[in-house]
Every structure is written in C-alpha cells, then in structure tokens.
UniProtKB/Swiss-Prot annotation:
Functions as a ribosomal silencing factor. Interacts with ribosomal protein uL14 (rplN), blocking formation of intersubunit bridge B8. Prevents association of the 30S and 50S ribosomal subunits and the formation of functional ribosomes, thus repressing translation. It is found in: Cytoplasm. This is Ribosomal silencing factor RsfS. The keyword Cytoplasm applies. Keywords: Cytoplasm, Repressor, Translation regulation. Interacts with ribosomal protein uL14 (rplN). Gene3D superfamilies: Beta Polymerase, domain 2 (3.30.460.10). The lineage of its organism: Bacteria, Bacillati, Bacillota, Bacilli, Bacillales.
Length: 118
C-alpha cells in the first residue's frame, strides 16, 4: 500500500472519532523520519485515546503495520508510527504549545481530498 493511501486511511480514522483541525504535511525531502506527518487534536484525554485507538484499528484492518505507538497512556501527545506516515494526535493544549505546523513551516500541506468534519 502506498503512503498516500495510508495517509487517507489514518485521516479517515481521525475524522471518525471527531478529531479537530486534521492536516497533513508533505515531509518528503524535508524529513528523514517520514514522507507525511498527519496532525490532529482531541479535546480530552479520552478523545485523544479514542482517536489513536481508531488509527491502530484501521491500520490493522487494512494490513498496515503499526511500527510504534507512544504516549497513549498519558494522552497528551500520541505518536502513531505507520512507517512513511507518522500521526501526531495531540491534546488541544499540547498542540498549540508544540505547534508542529510552525516548526515544519517549510513543508507544504498534503491534500487529503475527502470529506471531513473539521
């Protein structure tokens, strides 16, 4: 499965759990870590965990290997490593503090091109 398909599956999982401000940064040629960063946030610890759990469940259902998941128990910043796609699920407060969008401001936004409830 290609990176764009993985990105869309992960974004749809975020949307299914009503994640807010879902966006993807095209990191190809900018970061050695991943080709895409998918960033979103939830408004509570429970929502952050639900989003991360849904990403993992959808990855499993689609045969996508979850290489690592960090921060789930704390639910402030959960990182889900799907290989060339790394998903950052923040608690709302942490997202504004770390501001990855600004940190990686030279990365263009990737088109997610499907209906989302943002």
């Amino acid at each position: 499965m290609n990176q764009k398909s993985i990105l869309k599956i992960a974004a749809a999982a975020c949307d299914d759990k009503r994640a807010e401000d879902i966006l993807a940064l095209d990191m190809e040629g900018i970061s050695l870590v991943a080709d895409y960063f998918l960033i979103c946030h939830g408004n509570s610890d429970k929502q952050v965990q639900a989003i991360a759990r849904e990403i993992k469940d959808q990855a499993d259902e689609n045969g996508i290997q979850v290489k690592k998941m960090e921060g789930f128990d704390e639910a402030r910043w959960v990182l889900v490593d799907l290989g060339d796609v790394v998903v950052h699920v923040f608690h709302k407060d942490e997202r504004s503090y770390y501001n990855l969008e600004k940190l990686w401001g030279d990365a263009p936004l990737a088109d997610l091109d499907f209906g989302m409830n943002q």
